[in-house]
């Protein structure tokens, strides 16, 4: 296959590892491991120095056209399309800002710092939630009301804007890392330290177990309807079916995009059953579920794909890797 980046895309030399890529309107923001944010919009290409150290996480601001980034400098920065960068929460902590999630539906922003989730409403810190151990991951539901946090021994669900909410505990022994909520908040899924997923169906708290991965899952992506959950951590994407009351229990996953390289990133198209898959060797593919038709977005490079993001209209996809190679491909 000829890589689509050469036919209908553009290559970018990012200059540092890509922490994440996010589309905000027509602008693509690459958050980088050296503290910079690179903004590409048409012919415009702007670089902002948002942090003094590495950017560890990023999410679009829920109320403005800008990107929120968390760094190892303990700060949260807001970078606009113009390249202007300002403090959203300066010197928030001496600890790293490991996780950031936000919701345009509710306006809430949540930052994971050590054992605390710090909640912002309209840009103002309102309260903090404590957890029994360091937070492994944060996730909000589609309405931005429920906040899931993973930690040692399970996960906890809270109403994000209810400062006195004691939370719903979802126990399961072991270390829980990344976490995701299904679009309708019926399922909470965590990545475990031992190369497996654990999940709970709500409100019954029914336990789900999904194992057999050769590596840890670090990337999740739900399709728009919440019928499929794509995951990384194998030599294909592992896509679990969540239609029906029992979710994936007793059902085999789909395994699109089989290659001799670990999948490191997955991203569903915003409206169709089309999955973008990034690999440890730097390659990226597109697979359509209806006929398993594949398209090579980019060829292998020198580093694992760490960033995959669709534009809202599903016509462009951004790719970034840990070696500093980036691309925007029209599909």
Question: PLM features: what roles do these ranges have?
Answer:
Residues 1-331:
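WD40-repeat beta-propeller superdomains and closely related acidic/aromatic-rich repeat-like regions
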């Amino acid at each position: 296959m000829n890589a689509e980046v050469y036919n209908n895309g553009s290559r970018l030399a990012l200059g540092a590892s890509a922490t994440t890529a996010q589309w905000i309107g027509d602008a693509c923001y690459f958050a980088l491991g050296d503290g910079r944010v690179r903004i590409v919009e048409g012919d415009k290409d702007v670089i902002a120095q948002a942090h003094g150290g590495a950017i560890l996480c990023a999410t679009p601001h829920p109320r403005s056209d800008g990107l929120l980034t968390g760094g190892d400098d303990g700060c949260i920065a807001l970078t606009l399309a113009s390249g202007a960068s300002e403090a959203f929460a300066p010197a928030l902590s001496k600890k790293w800002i490991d996780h950031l999630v936000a919701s345009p539906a509710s306006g809430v922003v949540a930052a994971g710092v050590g054992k605390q989730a710090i909640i912002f409403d309209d840009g103002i810190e309102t309260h903090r939630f404590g957890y029994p151990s360091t937070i492994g991951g944060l996730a909000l539901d589609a309405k931005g009301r429920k906040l899931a946090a993973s930690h040692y021994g399970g996960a906890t669900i809270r109403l994000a804007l209810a400062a006195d909410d004691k939370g719903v505990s979802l126990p399961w022994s072991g270390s829980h890392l990344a976490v995701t909520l299904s679009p309708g908040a019926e399922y909470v899924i965590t990545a475990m330290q031992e190369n497996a997923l654990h999940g709970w169906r709500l409100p019954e708290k029914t336990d789900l177990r999904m194992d057999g991965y050769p590596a840890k899952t670090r990337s999740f992506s739900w399709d728009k309807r919440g019928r499929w959950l794509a995951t990384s951590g194998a030599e294909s994407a592992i896509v679990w079916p969540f239609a029906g009351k029992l979710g994936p229990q007793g059902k085999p996953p789909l395994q699109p995009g089989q290659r001799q390289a670990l999948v490191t990133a997955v991203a569903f198209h915003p409206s169709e059953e089309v999955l973008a898959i990034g690999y440890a060797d730097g390659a990226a593919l597109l697979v359509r579920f209806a006929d398993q038709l594949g398209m090579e977005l980019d060829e292998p490079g020198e580093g694992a794909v760490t960033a995959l993001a669709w534009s809202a209209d599903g016509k462009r996809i951004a790719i970034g890797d840990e070696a500093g190679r980036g691309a925007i491909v029209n599909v």
